[in-house]
Protein backbone atom coordinates (compact mmCIF):
# COMPACT_ATOMS: atom_id res chain seq x y z
CA UNK A 1 0.00 0.00 0.00
CA UNK A 2 1.48 3.40 -0.95
CA UNK A 3 2.19 5.78 1.92
CA UNK A 4 -0.27 8.62 2.56
CA UNK A 5 2.45 11.10 1.56
CA UNK A 6 2.97 9.35 -1.79
CA UNK A 7 -0.79 9.24 -2.39
CA UNK A 8 -1.07 12.98 -1.72
CA UNK A 9 1.92 13.73 -3.96
CA UNK A 10 0.51 11.70 -6.87
CA UNK A 11 -2.92 13.29 -6.60
CA UNK A 12 -1.33 16.75 -6.41
CA UNK A 13 0.54 16.12 -9.67
CA UNK A 14 -2.62 14.89 -11.38
CA UNK A 15 -4.49 18.02 -10.26
CA UNK A 16 -1.81 20.11 -12.01
CA UNK A 17 -2.05 18.39 -15.40
CA UNK A 18 -3.66 20.94 -17.75
CA UNK A 19 -6.86 20.03 -19.62
CA UNK A 20 -6.13 18.41 -22.97
CA UNK A 21 -2.78 17.05 -21.80
CA UNK A 22 -1.73 13.75 -20.24
CA UNK A 23 1.08 12.23 -18.23
CA UNK A 24 2.00 8.57 -18.05
CA UNK A 25 2.29 6.64 -14.80
CA UNK A 26 6.05 6.69 -15.35
CA UNK A 27 6.07 10.45 -15.93
CA UNK A 28 4.38 11.04 -12.59
CA UNK A 29 6.74 8.67 -10.81
CA UNK A 30 9.73 10.42 -12.40
CA UNK A 31 8.40 13.86 -11.44
CA UNK A 32 8.17 12.66 -7.84
CA UNK A 33 11.67 11.20 -7.83
CA UNK A 34 10.27 7.67 -7.70
CA UNK A 35 11.06 4.65 -9.82
CA UNK A 36 7.66 3.12 -9.15
CA UNK A 37 5.14 3.76 -11.92
CA UNK A 38 3.13 0.77 -10.69
CA UNK A 39 2.73 2.50 -7.34
CA UNK A 40 1.34 5.51 -9.23
CA UNK A 41 -1.07 3.13 -10.96
CA UNK A 42 -2.11 1.71 -7.60
CA UNK A 43 -2.80 5.21 -6.27
CA UNK A 44 -4.88 5.99 -9.34
CA UNK A 45 -6.82 2.73 -8.99
CA UNK A 46 -7.64 3.47 -5.36
CA UNK A 47 -8.01 7.26 -5.33
CA UNK A 48 -8.13 8.44 -8.95
CA UNK A 49 -11.86 9.13 -8.80
CA UNK A 50 -11.04 12.30 -6.83
CA UNK A 51 -9.04 13.85 -9.70
CA UNK A 52 -9.01 14.03 -13.52
CA UNK A 53 -8.06 10.34 -13.81
CA UNK A 54 -8.35 10.33 -17.62
CA UNK A 55 -5.24 12.53 -17.81
CA UNK A 56 -3.06 9.68 -16.50
CA UNK A 57 -2.38 6.99 -19.09
CA UNK A 58 -0.03 4.08 -19.69
CA UNK A 59 3.00 4.64 -21.93
CA UNK A 60 1.19 2.73 -24.71
CA UNK A 61 -1.14 5.70 -25.22
CA UNK A 62 -4.19 3.58 -24.49
CA UNK A 63 -6.81 5.11 -22.20
CA UNK A 64 -6.86 3.88 -18.60
CA UNK A 65 -7.66 0.16 -18.61
CA UNK A 66 -11.36 -0.57 -18.50
CA UNK A 67 -12.29 3.10 -18.78
CA UNK A 68 -11.96 3.89 -22.49
CA UNK A 69 -15.66 4.56 -22.98
CA UNK A 70 -15.86 6.78 -19.88
CA UNK A 71 -12.68 8.69 -20.76
CA UNK A 72 -13.50 9.51 -24.41
CA UNK A 73 -16.01 12.31 -23.68
CA UNK A 74 -13.45 13.95 -21.37
CA UNK A 75 -10.77 13.79 -24.08
CA UNK A 76 -13.13 15.20 -26.68
CA UNK A 77 -14.33 18.01 -24.40
CA UNK A 78 -10.77 18.99 -23.47
CA UNK A 79 -9.42 18.67 -27.02
CA UNK A 80 -6.91 15.98 -26.09
CA UNK A 81 -5.18 14.79 -29.29
CA UNK A 82 -6.33 11.28 -30.17
CA UNK A 83 -5.50 8.84 -32.94
CA UNK A 84 -7.08 5.78 -34.48
CA UNK A 85 -10.54 6.49 -33.07
CA UNK A 86 -12.46 3.49 -34.36
CA UNK A 87 -15.03 3.49 -31.57
CA UNK A 88 -15.48 4.56 -27.95
CA UNK A 89 -13.58 1.41 -26.96
CA UNK A 90 -10.85 1.48 -29.62
CA UNK A 91 -8.54 4.50 -29.73
CA UNK A 92 -5.27 5.87 -28.42
CA UNK A 93 -4.09 9.18 -27.04
CA UNK A 94 -1.61 10.84 -29.41
CA UNK A 95 1.20 10.97 -26.87
CA UNK A 96 3.51 12.88 -29.20
CA UNK A 97 1.09 15.81 -28.96
CA UNK A 98 -0.81 15.26 -25.71
CA UNK A 99 1.97 14.23 -23.34
CA UNK A 100 3.17 16.94 -21.01
CA UNK A 101 6.77 17.77 -21.93
CA UNK A 102 9.54 17.23 -19.40
CA UNK A 103 10.29 20.95 -19.62
CA UNK A 104 6.83 21.81 -18.25
CA UNK A 105 6.87 23.63 -14.93
CA UNK A 106 4.99 20.79 -13.24
CA UNK A 107 8.23 18.81 -13.09
CA UNK A 108 10.04 21.62 -11.27
CA UNK A 109 7.08 22.30 -8.97
CA UNK A 110 6.74 18.79 -7.64
CA UNK A 111 10.32 17.55 -7.71
CA UNK A 112 11.54 16.51 -4.26
Q: Which functions belong to the PLM regions below?
A:
Residues 1-112:
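Nucleic acid-binding interface residues in structured DNA/RNA-binding domains
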Amino acid sequence: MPSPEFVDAVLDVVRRIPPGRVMTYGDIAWALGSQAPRAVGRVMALYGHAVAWWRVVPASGLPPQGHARLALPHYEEEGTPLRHVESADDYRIALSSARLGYDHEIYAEVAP
